UniProtKB/Swiss-Prot annotation:
Superkingdom of origin: Bacteria
GO terms for biological process, alphabetical: catabolic process
Binding locations of cis,cis-muconate: 99, 128, 203
Domain HTH lysR-type, residue spans: 1-58
Record's protein name: HTH-type transcriptional regulator BenM
Binding site for benzoate 1: 99
Swiss-Prot/TrEMBL domain comment: Contains a secondary binding site for benzoate in addition to a primary effector binding site that can accommodate either cis,cis-muconate or benzoate. The existence of this secondary binding site may explain the synergistic effects of cis,cis-muconate and benzoate.
GO annotations of cellular component type: protein-DNA complex
InterPro entries xrefs: LysR_subst-bd (IPR005119), Tscrpt_reg_HTH_LysR (IPR000847), WH-like_DNA-bd_sf (IPR036388), WH_DNA-bd_sf (IPR036390)
Entry keyword Transcription regulation: yes
Pfam families linked: HTH_1, LysR_substrate
DNA-binding region: 18-37
Amino acid sequence: MELRHLRYFVAVVEEQSFTKAADKLCIAQPPLSRQIQNLEEELGIQLLERGSRPVKTTPEGHFFYQYAIKLLSNVDQMVSMTKRIASVEKTIRIGFVGSLLFGLLPRIIHLYRQAHPNLRIELYEMGTKAQTEALKEGRIDAGFGRLKISDPAIKRTLLRNERLMVAVHASHPLNQMKDKGVHLNDLIDEKILLYPSSPKPNFSTHVMNIFSDHGLEPTKINEVREVQLALGLVAAGEGISLVPASTQSIQLFNLSYVPLLDPDAITPIYIAVRNMEESTYIYSLYETIRQIYAYEGFTEPPNW
């Protein structure tokens, strides 16, 4: 059995047609049919239902297909990573969600640059979902995000959980609780500004899920493009917003931050890399994160 047999079989299953699969693979249909027959004979198992239109897998064929696509994906990743390692220019590409710039990420990147003065570091702002695809396609090497998106090709590690705060106008009644804090059910009747508006899932999805977990359903929800816009509107008296605690570094006239007391009112911070990633630069990035976290006094630094 060779990799081409797996690629031929996967193409037939996905196209549900020998003719379309042959066109996709740029080979004639008769040789393709013979290769599939040879594969079945080698396995001693019928993988495709005979005479079905469109082409369908047998139960055994479906099982074989699931593992074939995983194996081919790993092979493609191996080839991509090998070519990247062989590249003359050493570059690491890092994706991040914008709100992390108000926390520890700038310090992590700065210390990492100091540790690797000859390494080219490229930064790309993108959502967690986009980071997942960019990692799989080799467009970035690491991603910092706030959502846990499961993907067998990606290793995602929780760095820490960050508390959520309520951003309010200084004249808002909730600001009277600035020293004590408020709960989610205190916000249910407020006009809430969430961000970003797209693509989903995103931070606004996470916030709405927290409300839902408490059996709460805010009805006055406005979604805006980014955190800076949300906070600017809050400062203008247009509503309130739920933001990570690190966002308090954004200070605007008449903008105030009130603690949110619910234990699960948190937003996680993850780092994501490819599952087979073994670059020394990635391990060095881990070590840089450990140093910053230790300096900040986090009791349980990430353990890779």
